[in-house]
Structures are given as structure tokens and as C-alpha cells.
Amino acid sequence: MELVLKDAQSALEVSETTFGREFNEALVHQVVVAYAAGARQGTRAQKTRSDVSGGGKKPWRQKGTGRARSGTIRSPIWVGGGVTFAARPQDHSQKVNKKMYRGAVKSILSELVRQDRLIVVEKFSVEAPKTQELKAKLKELDLKDVLIITEELDENLFLAARNLYKVDVRDVQGIDPVSLIAFDKVLVTAAAVKKIEESLT
């Protein structure tokens, strides 16, 4: 299959298995959820009765005071005591094998092509790290909410995009399923398309 280049009167030959496969919604959902889960910090913690300091001595004797029996001031029913079912640091990451990950990325790329959300250009860069220059270039292409993918990370482009709302710049190594679906359009260079194909085969 062919992808038409936006800035040239030509087309780029690409693999049908990478850019023309059927959309697998269940797989994409599973991989995106797993990817988002892996980004969770999971470092919250509370203290149980065994973690709270103090409470070694029995507050009063077992019998004869008229008060309810008590063995420690760190009991969960006491103010300043431990928490009954305390939160513990946990790892939320889910296992996603390479075949599933690649399948999900191919599925997303194919759907972007079908929805005319993938824009391929021969090259895309700015001469200086100036936000206004990049803004003008994106206006020419009528792009506002866009992920720009280049073969290698272009520092000028990266710096120029830092202060633009809903504009992100990634190299091929930096793309992931979440970023591909987070933007309205995906602008990718021809060299990056070839590199993406190589990485997914």
C-alpha cells in the first residue's frame, strides 16, 4: 500500500501488515491500560499497628478498673493507633509481551491511516528553536493538536514545541500506544515511517 506525502507529489510504499491491518480494539485497550498502569507510582503507604511507634506497655491492668480491656495504645480503635487495612506500596505494572505490543501499535497506526489522522511528510524541521517558527509551520498544515514523529530527536524542533499546547515531538524510539491515540493528528516524516516499519517487524 502507499501513503501520500503531504509536502511532495509522490507516495511512500509501506507494508500492509503495519499500516493496513484490521483494528483490534480489545488488544489496543489491553495494551493502553497496561501502559497507563505501568506509569502509576504506587508508593502510598500507611502504618498498621505493628508499624506505629510505642504501645509496648499495657495501658491499664486487665481487670478491676471498670474500663474496657486494652492491650496497646496503638490498637486501630485508638486515636493515634495503626490503620486496620493499611495501604502498602504496590507495583501496578502489567506484563505485555512483544507480540501484543507490536500488534497494538500496528493496529493504532492502521486506524490512524483509515481516519486520515496520519500525515506523512518528506521532512519536517525548524531552523532555530523558535516556537513562533514551528507555530507558523503547523498553521500552514492546519495542525493544532498534533504528535510530531521524526527519525532521530531534532533538538530545535523539540525545544520549539515545548511551550505549545497539545503539540509533542518524539523520535521513533519515544513513541508508545498512549501517545499515538492522545493526539488528534500524527505528523510523521518519511524516514521515521521506514524506521517504524523496521522496528515492528
Swiss-Prot record:
- What keywords would UniProt list here? Ribonucleoprotein, Ribosomal protein, RNA-binding, rRNA-binding
Which Gene Ontology molecular function entries are recorded, alphabetically?
Answer: rRNA binding; structural constituent of ribosome
Region feature Disordered, mapped onto this chain: 43-71
Q: Does the keyword section mention Glycoprotein?
A: no
Q: Which GO terms describe its cellular component?
A: ribonucleoprotein complex; ribosome
Keyword GTP-binding in annotation? no
Q: Which domain of life is it from?
A: Bacteria
Gene3D superfamilies xref list? 3.40.1370.10
Segments spanning the bilayer are none
The record's InterPro entries line, in alphabetical order, gives: Ribosomal_uL4 (IPR002136), Ribosomal_uL4-like (IPR013005), Ribosomal_uL4_dom_sf (IPR023574)
Biological processes annotated in GO? translation
What HAMAP family does UniProt report for this protein, alphabetically? Ribosomal_uL4_B
Report the sequence similarity comment from the record: Belongs to the universal ribosomal protein uL4 family.
Q: What is this protein called?
A: Large ribosomal subunit protein uL4
Encoding gene, per UniProt annotation: rplD
